[in-house]
Amino acid sequence: DPPDLDPQWDADARPLLSPAHLGWVRALPATLTIGDVFLCHATPQDDVTRWLNHVTPQGHVAPNSLPDIASRAEGIPQSLLLCGHSHVAEAVRLPDGRLIVNPGSVGVPGFDDRSHRIVTGAPHARYALLDQTTYGWSVTFRMVPYDTAPAVALARARHRPDWAEVLETGWIT
């Protein structure tokens, strides 16, 4: 159980997944390349390490150094590298011109793990539009409102007031 994973999250979700669901997830590749785009969940090396930021001993999220970010991209020739995991929308341009983008989260605007807390301040779905231009990749981060009521009701029904609050407000108090 990696230190930044919420065991309650797994406990809530696992009973809802059939063996077929779990098999499908296990069969997914750790990374994927589509043309000039490289995709991974967290970093190219593993599924739980944050690529663009880290959690300080005090529980704050801080940016990783550019050399650390770039070292994780070594050997990847694609010009656009997509990652996630942190639920924080951000982009970093590497010294060689490649761009790393985390689009944010569509359905989890915050969470409180054992080691840190993430809040976005709004319940909106977040994603990124990406266009390849003559001068490189153009990124437009989007923040879109949606009806969170069904997810909030489900969180409350599952006795997760923390999830209900963050889904409804984008905040954890």
Please provide the spans of the model-predicted regions.
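Divalent metal-coordination and catalytic microenvironments
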Residues: V25, H41, H85, G104, ...
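Acidic, His/Gly-rich catalytic cores of divalent-metal-dependent hydrolytic chemistry
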Residues: R93-T173
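Short solvent-exposed loop/turn micro-motifs enriched in small/polar/acidic residues
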Residues: G23-A27, G84-H85, G121-P123
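Active-site neighborhood of divalent metal-dependent phosphoester bond hydrolases
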Residues: D1-G35, Q45-D46, W51-P77
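Short active-site oxyanion
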Residues: P77-L80, S138
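Active-site environment of divalent metal-dependent phosphoester hydrolases
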Residues: Q45-D47, L80-L94, V108-D112
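Metal-dependent catalytic neighborhoods of phosphoester/phosphodiester hydrolases
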Residues: D1-P3, V92-P95
